[in-house]
Amino acid sequence: MDLLSSLPDEVRCLILSFLTTKESASTSVLSKKWRNLFALVPNLDFDDSEFLHPEEGKRERDGILQSFMDFVDRVLSLQGNSSIRKFSLKCETGVPPARVNRWLCEVLQRDVSDIDLTIDLGYGYYLPEELFVSETLVNLKLKSAFNIDWWPGAEGTSLPMLKSLCVYGVRVFCDDELQELLPCFPVLEELQMSNMQWLDSDETVSSATLTTLHITGIRSENPKSISFDTPNLLSFVYTDFVAEDYPLVNMKNLSLARLALRANDDQIKRVRGPSNDLLEYDVVRHFGNVVKLMNGIQNVQELHLCPDTLELLSVCCESMPVFNNVKKLLIYSDEDRGWQAVPVLLRNCPRLETLIFEGIVHHVTDKCGDACDCIFRKDKGRSLKSCPVKVVEINGFGVTMKEKYLIEHFLDYFSCLKEMKIYINCEEDGVTQQVMKNREVSKLVLDEMEEYNEFYSCNVKLFLCKKKSIPQ
């Protein structure tokens, strides 16, 4: 008897659970004992790429797609009515939607707790109604390269055990507002919605159980109001057009927040101009209410701000709250967006330890303050001197004189700085990479870094990295 066959059934079943379903199913040919054991494997993972790839054009061969569907049918049949813990399905267009729904209904009848679907079945596909009345479902993840009209509405929905809901699509639709959706999931802890089409211009996200909320909204205009009543939230990632108002923001226990508030170029232009030039009905007049959102997240420990967000915060610098708990601040920069809010952010984070820049090239305005050296001013470096930051990390360094001057500005005025990490932008075929291939230039850059270490008490390190990516 081989070593594996001599192991207890519980151990062999555990081993099978770490294999793909295709690999696990192949053990059933060894003996009847292995076949019976496979029927008890609680995790099923079906991926059509194992049948249809990597050979180019293999999908089009007669019978290949059919063999995948037959394999899923055989496995489900072989397992009989045994319980399923996790069901993962990845399949592209070509599998009939009715067949996919039949598989889903079968695993739902077998008390599945975790469903992970990556299904590109084309437009007009609807998930089975049975998926929304499960008494055992705990985790549900949906992903598609098409639009997802994923939820039929609050009426008839009952998922009392659901703790994690993640939906990713080109465009995600809901037939009801979020305030109607969330009560259907009374113990939900994680909600992630990518490219969600908001149903209304006034929305409220209210849940006492949510700890993770990641939303990317899609709309053509600024919403009237968005409220968040989520007192136990720990992680908040929010991308959407800036709202005219944030009446309620309750996030007292927040650990991480990343804000990507959007505004179009014309709105940004008006934000930079005098407020008395704005027309009475101009939506930009209400952008100052973004301070209500900042007040609601002021207990956060790690804060990420994207380029548009920085510009929008410039309209509420005078009323910006103090972030007493922020120890890590990450700033995404863009050459078309300004740093007007950076000085007040540095002053209002009295316990800041780590400051990360995803790029330091930004739009220069006369309101950038003393955070940069783009414009000469008498109070140069004031906000930097009072900042307690110990570590500065700069990603996407393009080896330009403008960037080097700004790095020296940081070294001159961050009085508590102990370490600076600089990551060169090394995008393939990029200008920076071509420059660094020049031995004389690369030697000059390295020599400058050595001079920094000799002249400043701060430890300056130079690394290579991929091109910075700015969240949209």
UniProtKB/Swiss-Prot annotation:
InterPro entries: F-box-like_dom_sf, F-box_AtFBL13-like, F-box_dom, FBD, FBL60-like, LRR_dom_sf, LRR_FXL15/At3g58940/PEG3-like
A Pfam family hit: F-box
Domain of life: Eukaryota
GO biological process: defense response
All copies of domain F-box, residue ranges: 1-49
PANTHER family per the UniProt record, alphabetical: BNAANNG15180D PROTEIN, RNI-LIKE SUPERFAMILY PROTEIN
Protein's recorded name: F-box protein At3g03040
